[in-house]
């Protein structure tokens, strides 16, 4: 019988995930959270600048539904709150501190107080407003500390980037970073073939694609994030392809990044996927791209903007 081994495999995967210790967030991961929450929650119109100035200053203002849901987004992204448990995760604060304490100048006593404060509050029903009201007093008291812990100062983040060349740097696309990480520098021949969307199937190229999928947030340890792939099609004005994209991914026989990548490239949406993928490469080097009001203007515009990136293999 086939079902039993499959079910057992799923349970084993979940067990391994649950057993893994929580890992501190690096500056790239934190920056992604902030910018993505901006993208998802900043309103259009004249009020946008007001919110942007306030949030940039780490002020959770104005006290309204927009800021409430922005705050929830950041708390989830920084993993200070778990949606599935409807609970704050205060035990992760000292882990974050230990990882960067020699660089971020955070005070250990204050870290303990911050942890205790977060442990003392209740998430209620987990709604945006409930989380906001619970966390706001903690935020206001420990905002300077939390900025140090979660890479929210320009100086602090720059210091960590400089000390950790092994993480993705600002201005570096995830495609370039992953090629560097897996190959230790560009395997120019295979990388050029790969960026021309040839499916070499080599073990190293599969690792590069896995790294890229994780960097673009298409995947994490729990599996494929279909909504993230669909979002990239939406951003190149191809929202009408959503049913087909979902169908292609759902019918893919493998569950690894390279499997999904291959399925998309062997599907009727392959040309649109290439355009979406290339556009995300550009944005992965500049998390503020969309926030500056820039939009997709076609593959030629993407190629032109890619020429200004020094850390990628150009088209």
Swiss-Prot record:
Q: Which GO terms describe its molecular function?
A: odorant binding; toxin activity
The stretch of residues making up the signal peptide is 1-18
Localization terms from the record? Secreted
Where is this chain primarily localised? Answer: secreted
Q: Which InterPro entries match?
A: PBP/GOBP, PBP_GOBP_sf
Keyword vocabulary terms for this entry: Blood coagulation cascade inhibiting toxin, Disulfide bond, Hemostasis impairing toxin, Secreted, Signal, Toxin
GO (cellular component) term, any one: extracellular region
Q: Which cystines does this chain contain?
A: 37-73, 69-128, 178-211, 252-263
Q: Tell me, what's a Pfam family for it?
A: PBP_GOBP
User: Organism's domain of life?
Assistant: Eukaryota
- Protein family per UniProt: Belongs to the PBP/GOBP family.
Listed under subunit, the entry gives: Interacts with host coagulation factor XII/F12 (inactive and activated). Interacts with host coagulation factor XI/F11 (inactive).
Kindly give the PANTHER family that the UniProt entry links to this protein: GEO07291P1-RELATED (PTHR11857:SF43), ODORANT BINDING PROTEIN-RELATED (PTHR11857)
Report the function annotation for this chain.
Modulates blood feeding of female mosquitoes on vertebrate species by binding and sequestering different mediators involved in the host response. Binds leukotriene B4 and leukotriene D4. Exhibits anticoagulant activity targeting the intrinsic coagulation pathway; binds coagulation factors XII and XI, preventing generation of activated FXIIa and FXIa.
Q: What is this protein called?
A: Long form salivary protein D7L2
Natural source organism:
Anopheles gambiae (African malaria mosquito)
């Amino acid at each position: 019988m086939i079902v039993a081994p499959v079910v057992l495999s799923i349970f084993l995967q979940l067990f391994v995930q649950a057993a893994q210790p929580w890992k501190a967030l690096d500056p790239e991961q934190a920056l992604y959270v902030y910018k993505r929450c901006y993208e998802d929650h900043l309103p259009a119109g004249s009020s946008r600048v007001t919110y942007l100035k306030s949030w940039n200053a780490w002020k959770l203002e104005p006290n309204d539904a927009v800021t409430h849901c922005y705050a929830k987004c950041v708390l989830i992204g920084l993993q200070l709150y778990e949606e599935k448990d409807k609970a704050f995760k205060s035990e992760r604060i000292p882990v974050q501190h230990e990882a960067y304490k020699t660089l971020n100048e955070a005070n250990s006593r204050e870290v303990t107080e911050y942890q205790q404060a977060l442990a003392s509050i209740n998430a209620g029903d987990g709604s945006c407003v409930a989380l906001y009201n619970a966390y706001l007093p903690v935020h206001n008291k420990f905002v300077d500390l939390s900025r140090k812990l979660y890479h929210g100062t320009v100086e602090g983040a720059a210091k960590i980037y400089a000390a950790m060349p092994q993480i993705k740097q600002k201005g570096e696309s995830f495609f370039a970073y992953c090629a560097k990480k897996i190959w230790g520098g560009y395997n120019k021949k295979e990388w050029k073939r790969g960026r021309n969307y040839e499916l070499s199937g080599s073990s190293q190229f599969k690792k590069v694609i896995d790294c890229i999928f994780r960097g673009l947030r298409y995947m994490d340890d729990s599996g494929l994030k279909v909504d993230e792939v669909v979002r990239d099609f939406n951003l190149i004005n191809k929202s009408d392809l959503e049913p087909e994209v979902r169908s292609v991914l759902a019918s893919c026989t493998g569950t690894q990044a390279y499997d999904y990548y291959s399925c998309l490239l062997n599907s009727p949406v392959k040309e649109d996927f290439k355009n979406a993928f290339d556009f995300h490469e550009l944005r992965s080097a500049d998390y503020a791209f969309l926030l500056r009001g820039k939009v997709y203007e076609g593959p030629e515009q993407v190629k032109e903007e890619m020429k200004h990136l020094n850390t990628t293999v150009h088209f």
